[in-house]
């Protein structure tokens, strides 16, 4: 008998580290192909789209993660059950908004390719994050915020309060 079920996706997928430094502004998420073997230190999202990558890589999702994720020492512990499954995604974004998120998400991926000798840990170190990558993320954040019907948030607490309001609305629909 197997000790654990086989989790290897059969198609392209997103990798999200289970544990990520508390110092990072963005959890480093990446696309992977089925030939890359999944270990137990990551969460996977099979068949994820560029839109999915964009929303999950945004400050909106990272703020949610920082507020509800568990901790391993002081680092964030990303959980599918708590963080991902309870995240309030943009409700009914327009095709134009989806396209803007996809374009901005692609710009994040393109910015990363400018540094082929750098690991994701290097790229997302807050002390050495390349300005071009940070700018791409900021553009993505604007596109994701727009899909939520917002143009800006003054603080992370304001952003999290907004997300919890959406979450409460989702819970109310279940009752």
Task: Label each residue range with its predicted role.
Residues 1-103, 107, 170-174:
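Polybasic, glycine- and aromatic-enriched phosphate-binding surface used to engage nucleic acids
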Residues 84-175:
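Non-catalytic DNA-recognition/assembly elements of restriction-modification systems
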């Amino acid at each position: 008998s197997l000790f654990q079920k086989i989790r290897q996706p059969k198609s392209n997928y997103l990798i999200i580290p289970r544990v990520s430094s508390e110092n990072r502004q963005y959890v480093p998420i990446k696309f992977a192909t089925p030939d890359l073997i999944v270990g137990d230190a990551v969460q996977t999202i099979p068949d994820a789209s560029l839109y999915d990558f964009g929303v999950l890589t945004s400050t909106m999702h990272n703020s949610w993660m920082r507020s509800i994720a568990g901790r391993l020492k002081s680092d964030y512990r990303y959980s599918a059950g708590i963080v991902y499954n309870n995240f309030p995604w943009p409700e009914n974004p327009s095709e134009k908004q989806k396209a803007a998120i996809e374009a901005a998400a692609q710009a994040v991926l393109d910015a990363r390719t400018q540094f082929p000798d750098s690991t994701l840990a290097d790229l997302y170190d807050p002390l050495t994050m390349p300005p071009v990558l940070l700018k791409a993320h900021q553009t993505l954040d604007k596109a994701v915020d727009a899909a939520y019907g917002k143009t800006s948030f003054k603080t992370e607490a304001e952003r999290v309060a907004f997300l919890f309001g959406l979450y409460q609305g989702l819970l109310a629909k279940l009752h």
